[in-house]
């Protein structure tokens, strides 16, 4: 199939479709022979070019430095010129890379030298704003501004803490009652004290201690303080003591330890919140417990009311054992027998029964 010019009808290219090539053996065989001949010619030319390249490489490596002439072969001469240009371009490229790296290093060295010179001038020379640091009025003004900011932050912190403490007291319903036996309550349960400790039933003591420990653990976050590990009481410890009277009697030493830790927590919070005057030396904590008792200290702490203090003997070292001795002497019992003695029960009506696991609440 011939393709001709539509104007002059001159044949410019011969085109065979795929159908004609596949269906005509004459065309297929002839084209295959042409392809085979072209492959042979290409292989011969490729081999010749490879030979020229080898000759040029050998001549360039051996004779070009001595100025000897290459063979009078036009192909060799052309390849020699082309390869020479290629080598020159490669060397120029390598030289340009080296120059670029040198310029980068030179620029970095200059920047570091300038930075070092600036630092030396700052160290050895006078300060830029010398009057700012030597003028007494400027210093006093800056101090006054910092003190004002600190005072504002302090007032905001105290106000926020007071609001949180008021919400906590409202949540736990801390009340003061006109009663000599049970003057203070928390969540409608009596606040335990040394004077009513022997007169309350064990379930009521356990319930009061649980509420007080819950309150003190929440108070730790409000005042942003951390109780010592030996002083901290987890709520699970109180739940493990909940149960029948026999179980409470077996766990009497644990209840005593919780009572001692409660007193320590109250004293720590009152000291951190400056409700106890720290300026006095050798504070007599036995006198404080005698005057305020546990319930009084707890109420003053919850309402942020300062308490009076008294200095004691200088040679007394206050510790947990010393506090245990004070509590035991106030209760009139030995350490191991504080909770094992018979407690006077709050007698209910005679026609009704009650269990030791019942919850007791103060009404009115």
Curated annotation (Swiss-Prot):
Coiled-Coils at the N-terminal half are essential for interaction with VPS30 and VPS34 and autophagy. It is a peripheral membrane protein. Component of the autophagy-specific VPS34 PI3-kinase complex I composed of VPS15, VPS30, VPS34, ATG14 and ATG38. Interacts directly with ATG38. Pfam families: ATG14. GO terms for biological process: cellular response to potassium ion starvation; cytoplasm to vacuole targeting by the Cvt pathway; pexophagy; piecemeal microautophagy of the nucleus. It comes from Candida glabrata (strain ATCC 2001 / BCRC 20586 / JCM 3761 / NBRC 0622 / NRRL Y-65 / CBS 138) (Yeast). The keyword Membrane applies. Disruption phenotype: leads to seven- to eightfold decrease of the renal fungal load and four-fold lower fungal burden in the brain of infected mice. Does not affect protein trafficking. GO terms for cellular component: fungal-type vacuole membrane; phagophore assembly site membrane; phosphatidylinositol 3-kinase complex, class III, type I; vacuole-isolation membrane contact site. It is found in: Preautophagosomal structure membrane; Vacuole membrane. The gene is ATG14. Residues 38-114 form a coiled coil. This is Autophagy-related protein 14. Residues 5-20 are annotated as: Cysteine repeats. Keywords: Autophagy, Coiled coil, Membrane, Protein transport, Transport, Vacuole. Belongs to the ATG14 family. The lineage of its organism: Eukaryota, Fungi, Dikarya, Ascomycota, Saccharomycotina. Required for cytoplasm to vacuole transport (Cvt) and autophagy as a part of the autophagy-specific VPS34 PI3-kinase complex I. This complex is essential to recruit the ATG8-phosphatidylinositol conjugate and the ATG12-ATG5 conjugate to the pre-autophagosomal structure. ATG14 mediates the specific binding of the VPS34 PI3-kinase complex I to the preautophagosomal structure (PAS). Required for survival and/or proliferation in kidneys and in brain.
